[in-house]
Protein backbone atom coordinates (compact mmCIF):
# COMPACT_ATOMS: atom_id res chain seq x y z
CA UNK A 1 0.00 0.00 0.00
CA UNK A 2 2.88 2.37 0.79
CA UNK A 3 4.17 1.79 -2.76
CA UNK A 4 0.76 2.79 -4.16
CA UNK A 5 0.72 6.05 -2.21
CA UNK A 6 4.27 6.91 -3.30
CA UNK A 7 3.42 6.16 -6.91
CA UNK A 8 0.30 8.29 -6.84
CA UNK A 9 2.06 11.09 -5.00
CA UNK A 10 4.56 11.29 -7.83
CA UNK A 11 1.72 12.32 -10.16
CA UNK A 12 1.68 15.77 -8.58
CA UNK A 13 4.86 16.67 -10.44
CA UNK A 14 3.85 15.08 -13.75
CA UNK A 15 1.79 16.60 -16.58
CA UNK A 16 -1.94 16.10 -16.89
CA UNK A 17 -4.16 16.55 -19.92
CA UNK A 18 -7.15 18.87 -19.51
CA UNK A 19 -10.07 16.99 -21.04
CA UNK A 20 -13.51 18.56 -20.83
CA UNK A 21 -16.03 16.00 -21.93
CA UNK A 22 -19.09 13.92 -21.24
CA UNK A 23 -19.22 10.15 -21.20
CA UNK A 24 -21.51 7.17 -20.66
CA UNK A 25 -20.31 3.88 -19.17
CA UNK A 26 -22.72 0.98 -18.83
CA UNK A 27 -22.95 -2.77 -18.35
CA UNK A 28 -25.65 -5.37 -18.97
CA UNK A 29 -25.41 -8.30 -16.57
CA UNK A 30 -27.85 -10.34 -18.68
CA UNK A 31 -25.51 -10.31 -21.71
CA UNK A 32 -22.13 -9.59 -20.12
CA UNK A 33 -21.60 -6.57 -22.36
CA UNK A 34 -19.72 -3.45 -21.26
CA UNK A 35 -19.98 -0.16 -23.16
CA UNK A 36 -18.34 3.25 -23.07
CA UNK A 37 -19.04 6.29 -25.25
CA UNK A 38 -17.81 9.87 -25.05
CA UNK A 39 -17.35 13.18 -26.84
CA UNK A 40 -15.16 16.23 -26.24
CA UNK A 41 -14.19 19.60 -27.69
CA UNK A 42 -10.49 18.69 -27.52
CA UNK A 43 -9.66 18.47 -31.22
CA UNK A 44 -7.35 15.46 -31.32
CA UNK A 45 -7.13 12.54 -33.71
CA UNK A 46 -9.53 9.59 -33.61
CA UNK A 47 -7.60 7.72 -30.91
CA UNK A 48 -6.80 10.60 -28.56
CA UNK A 49 -9.99 10.61 -26.46
CA UNK A 50 -10.46 6.86 -25.94
CA UNK A 51 -6.72 6.43 -25.57
CA UNK A 52 -6.50 8.53 -22.41
CA UNK A 53 -10.02 8.04 -21.04
CA UNK A 54 -11.42 4.54 -21.56
CA UNK A 55 -10.78 1.63 -19.21
CA UNK A 56 -12.27 -1.58 -20.61
CA UNK A 57 -12.14 -5.01 -18.95
CA UNK A 58 -14.28 -7.52 -20.88
CA UNK A 59 -16.37 -9.66 -18.57
CA UNK A 60 -15.56 -7.43 -15.58
CA UNK A 61 -16.40 -3.75 -16.02
CA UNK A 62 -15.74 -0.41 -17.66
CA UNK A 63 -14.72 3.09 -16.61
CA UNK A 64 -14.11 6.64 -17.81
CA UNK A 65 -11.17 8.67 -16.45
CA UNK A 66 -11.52 12.30 -17.51
CA UNK A 67 -11.32 16.04 -16.65
CA UNK A 68 -7.65 16.63 -15.76
CA UNK A 69 -6.54 13.28 -17.12
CA UNK A 70 -3.48 11.50 -15.76
CA UNK A 71 -1.00 11.69 -18.64
CA UNK A 72 1.10 8.93 -17.09
CA UNK A 73 -1.87 6.50 -17.27
CA UNK A 74 -1.17 5.44 -13.67
CA UNK A 75 -4.77 6.11 -12.60
CA UNK A 76 -6.16 4.35 -15.65
CA UNK A 77 -4.02 1.27 -15.04
CA UNK A 78 -5.02 1.26 -11.37
CA UNK A 79 -8.69 1.13 -12.38
CA UNK A 80 -7.94 -1.52 -15.03
CA UNK A 81 -6.08 -3.77 -12.60
CA UNK A 82 -8.61 -3.38 -9.79
CA UNK A 83 -11.56 -4.17 -12.07
CA UNK A 84 -9.76 -7.35 -13.11
CA UNK A 85 -9.42 -8.27 -9.43
CA UNK A 86 -13.14 -7.70 -8.82
CA UNK A 87 -12.64 -4.70 -6.54
CA UNK A 88 -15.81 -2.72 -5.76
CA UNK A 89 -15.88 0.55 -7.79
CA UNK A 90 -16.39 2.52 -4.57
CA UNK A 91 -13.19 1.02 -3.20
CA UNK A 92 -11.41 1.88 -6.46
CA UNK A 93 -12.44 5.52 -6.01
CA UNK A 94 -10.98 5.37 -2.50
CA UNK A 95 -7.67 4.13 -3.92
CA UNK A 96 -7.71 6.90 -6.52
CA UNK A 97 -8.24 9.50 -3.79
CA UNK A 98 -4.58 9.05 -2.77
CA UNK A 99 -3.63 10.93 -5.95
CA UNK A 100 -2.69 14.53 -4.97
CA UNK A 101 -4.55 15.72 -8.09
CA UNK A 102 -7.71 13.76 -7.20
CA UNK A 103 -9.88 16.88 -6.97
CA UNK A 104 -9.02 17.76 -10.58
CA UNK A 105 -10.12 14.34 -11.86
CA UNK A 106 -13.49 12.86 -12.83
CA UNK A 107 -14.33 9.15 -12.85
CA UNK A 108 -17.27 6.89 -13.63
CA UNK A 109 -16.87 3.16 -12.92
CA UNK A 110 -19.37 0.29 -13.33
CA UNK A 111 -18.75 -3.45 -12.99
CA UNK A 112 -20.66 -6.53 -14.07
CA UNK A 113 -21.80 -7.19 -10.52
CA UNK A 114 -23.91 -4.04 -10.88
CA UNK A 115 -21.72 -1.99 -8.57
CA UNK A 116 -20.99 1.59 -9.63
CA UNK A 117 -19.31 4.73 -8.38
CA UNK A 118 -18.36 8.19 -9.58
CA UNK A 119 -16.29 11.17 -8.59
CA UNK A 120 -16.36 14.78 -9.82
CA UNK A 121 -13.45 16.75 -8.38
CA UNK A 122 -13.96 20.09 -6.68
CA UNK A 123 -11.78 21.79 -9.31
CA UNK A 124 -13.53 20.23 -12.33
CA UNK A 125 -14.73 22.95 -14.69
CA UNK A 126 -18.37 24.09 -14.33
CA UNK A 127 -20.73 22.35 -15.03
CA UNK A 128 -19.40 19.04 -13.62
CA UNK A 129 -21.68 16.19 -12.56
CA UNK A 130 -21.89 12.40 -12.34
CA UNK A 131 -24.98 10.21 -11.91
CA UNK A 132 -25.12 6.43 -11.40
CA UNK A 133 -28.07 4.06 -11.46
CA UNK A 134 -29.91 1.02 -12.78
CA UNK A 135 -32.57 0.77 -15.48
CA UNK A 136 -35.68 -0.45 -13.57
CA UNK A 137 -36.66 -4.02 -14.35
CA UNK A 138 -33.37 -4.80 -16.10
CA UNK A 139 -29.80 -5.86 -15.35
CA UNK A 140 -28.45 -2.68 -16.96
CA UNK A 141 -26.32 -0.36 -14.79
CA UNK A 142 -24.72 2.94 -15.74
CA UNK A 143 -22.66 5.97 -14.80
CA UNK A 144 -22.99 9.18 -16.81
CA UNK A 145 -20.62 12.09 -16.16
CA UNK A 146 -19.37 15.32 -17.67
CA UNK A 147 -17.40 18.48 -16.98
CA UNK A 148 -17.18 21.96 -18.55
CA UNK A 149 -20.69 21.36 -19.83
CA UNK A 150 -23.15 24.00 -20.96
CA UNK A 151 -25.38 25.18 -18.08
CA UNK A 152 -28.61 23.23 -17.94
CA UNK A 153 -29.45 19.56 -17.73
CA UNK A 154 -26.82 17.88 -19.93
CA UNK A 155 -26.13 14.90 -17.65
CA UNK A 156 -29.71 14.54 -16.27
CA UNK A 157 -31.10 14.63 -19.82
CA UNK A 158 -28.62 11.95 -20.86
CA UNK A 159 -29.76 9.81 -17.92
CA UNK A 160 -33.43 10.23 -18.91
CA UNK A 161 -32.66 9.23 -22.49
CA UNK A 162 -30.69 6.20 -21.31
CA UNK A 163 -33.55 5.06 -19.08
CA UNK A 164 -36.25 5.62 -21.71
CA UNK A 165 -34.49 4.08 -24.72
CA UNK A 166 -35.44 0.63 -25.98
CA UNK A 167 -33.31 -2.13 -27.41
CA UNK A 168 -29.77 -3.23 -26.62
CA UNK A 169 -27.47 -1.53 -24.13
CA UNK A 170 -25.65 0.14 -27.04
CA UNK A 171 -28.96 1.67 -28.17
CA UNK A 172 -29.37 3.18 -24.70
CA UNK A 173 -25.83 4.54 -24.69
CA UNK A 174 -26.23 6.09 -28.14
CA UNK A 175 -29.51 7.72 -27.08
CA UNK A 176 -27.80 9.19 -24.01
CA UNK A 177 -24.98 10.58 -26.15
CA UNK A 178 -27.50 12.29 -28.43
CA UNK A 179 -29.42 13.76 -25.48
CA UNK A 180 -26.23 15.25 -24.02
CA UNK A 181 -25.36 16.68 -27.43
CA UNK A 182 -28.85 18.17 -27.84
CA UNK A 183 -28.56 19.70 -24.36
CA UNK A 184 -25.42 21.61 -25.28
CA UNK A 185 -22.66 19.10 -24.53
CA UNK A 186 -19.18 20.51 -24.08
CA UNK A 187 -19.43 24.29 -23.66
CA UNK A 188 -16.34 25.22 -25.68
CA UNK A 189 -17.05 24.50 -29.33
CA UNK A 190 -19.63 25.30 -31.99
CA UNK A 191 -19.91 25.51 -35.78
CA UNK A 192 -17.73 28.39 -37.03
CA UNK A 193 -17.93 29.09 -40.77
CA UNK A 194 -15.13 27.08 -42.45
CA UNK A 195 -12.83 28.61 -45.04
CA UNK A 196 -14.03 28.01 -48.58
CA UNK A 197 -11.05 25.79 -49.35
CA UNK A 198 -11.11 23.87 -46.05
CA UNK A 199 -11.70 20.09 -46.05
CA UNK A 200 -14.94 20.68 -44.13
CA UNK A 201 -16.35 23.27 -46.54
CA UNK A 202 -18.84 20.86 -48.15
CA UNK A 203 -19.82 19.02 -44.96
CA UNK A 204 -22.82 20.28 -42.95
CA UNK A 205 -22.42 21.24 -39.31
CA UNK A 206 -25.51 21.00 -37.11
CA UNK A 207 -25.37 22.06 -33.47
CA UNK A 208 -21.77 21.03 -32.91
CA UNK A 209 -20.94 20.51 -29.21
CA UNK A 210 -17.78 18.40 -29.59
CA UNK A 211 -14.91 17.75 -32.02
CA UNK A 212 -14.47 14.00 -31.50
CA UNK A 213 -16.66 11.12 -30.31
CA UNK A 214 -16.62 7.34 -29.98
CA UNK A 215 -18.56 4.31 -28.78
CA UNK A 216 -17.00 0.97 -27.78
CA UNK A 217 -18.64 -2.32 -26.79
CA UNK A 218 -16.92 -5.41 -25.45
CA UNK A 219 -18.54 -8.83 -25.16
CA UNK A 220 -17.54 -10.95 -22.18
CA UNK A 221 -15.61 -13.21 -24.58
CA UNK A 222 -13.47 -10.31 -25.87
CA UNK A 223 -9.88 -10.10 -24.69
CA UNK A 224 -7.71 -7.56 -22.88
CA UNK A 225 -4.54 -6.08 -24.26
CA UNK A 226 -1.50 -5.15 -22.21
CA UNK A 227 -2.94 -1.73 -21.39
CA UNK A 228 -6.28 -0.36 -20.23
CA UNK A 229 -7.97 -0.08 -23.63
CA UNK A 230 -6.04 -1.91 -26.35
CA UNK A 231 -7.79 -5.27 -26.29
CA UNK A 232 -9.84 -6.90 -29.04
CA UNK A 233 -13.38 -5.51 -28.83
CA UNK A 234 -16.52 -6.44 -30.75
CA UNK A 235 -17.42 -2.86 -31.69
CA UNK A 236 -15.33 0.32 -31.65
CA UNK A 237 -16.57 3.31 -33.69
CA UNK A 238 -14.61 6.58 -33.67
CA UNK A 239 -15.23 10.00 -35.20
CA UNK A 240 -12.74 12.85 -35.63
CA UNK A 241 -12.73 16.09 -37.62
CA UNK A 242 -11.49 16.10 -41.24
CA UNK A 243 -7.73 15.45 -41.57
CA UNK A 244 -7.62 14.08 -37.99
CA UNK A 245 -7.13 10.37 -38.58
CA UNK A 246 -8.44 7.29 -40.35
CA UNK A 247 -11.92 7.75 -38.87
CA UNK A 248 -12.26 11.42 -39.79
CA UNK A 249 -15.60 12.89 -40.86
CA UNK A 250 -16.13 12.88 -44.63
CA UNK A 251 -18.71 14.05 -47.17
CA UNK A 252 -22.15 12.62 -46.50
CA UNK A 253 -21.65 12.93 -42.73
CA UNK A 254 -21.81 15.87 -40.29
CA UNK A 255 -19.17 18.00 -38.57
CA UNK A 256 -21.10 17.39 -35.35
CA UNK A 257 -19.31 14.15 -34.36
CA UNK A 258 -22.25 12.84 -32.33
CA UNK A 259 -24.50 13.04 -35.39
CA UNK A 260 -21.87 11.25 -37.44
CA UNK A 261 -21.43 8.69 -34.68
CA UNK A 262 -25.17 8.01 -34.91
CA UNK A 263 -24.86 7.45 -38.68
CA UNK A 264 -21.98 5.04 -38.22
CA UNK A 265 -23.66 3.31 -35.30
CA UNK A 266 -26.87 2.79 -37.28
CA UNK A 267 -24.86 1.29 -40.15
CA UNK A 268 -23.15 -1.10 -37.71
CA UNK A 269 -26.43 -1.91 -35.95
CA UNK A 270 -27.98 -3.07 -39.23
CA UNK A 271 -25.28 -5.73 -39.51
CA UNK A 272 -26.26 -7.31 -36.19
CA UNK A 273 -28.60 -10.31 -35.98
CA UNK A 274 -32.16 -9.99 -34.74
CA UNK A 275 -31.04 -11.69 -31.54
CA UNK A 276 -28.80 -8.74 -30.64
CA UNK A 277 -30.55 -7.06 -27.73
Please identify what each model-predicted range represents.
Residues 19-277:
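N-terminal nucleophile
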Residues 5-17:
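Bacterial N-terminal signal peptides
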Residues 1-2:
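N-terminal secretory signal peptides that target proteins for export/translocation
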Amino acid sequence: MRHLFLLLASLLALPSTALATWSVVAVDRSTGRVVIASATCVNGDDQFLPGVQAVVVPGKGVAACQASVDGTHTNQMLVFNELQKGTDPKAIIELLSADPAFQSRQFGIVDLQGRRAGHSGLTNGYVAQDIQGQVPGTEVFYSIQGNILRPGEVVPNAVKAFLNAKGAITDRVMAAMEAADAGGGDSRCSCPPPAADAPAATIPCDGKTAHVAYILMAEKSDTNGDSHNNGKYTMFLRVAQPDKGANAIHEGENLNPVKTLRLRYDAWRKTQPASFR
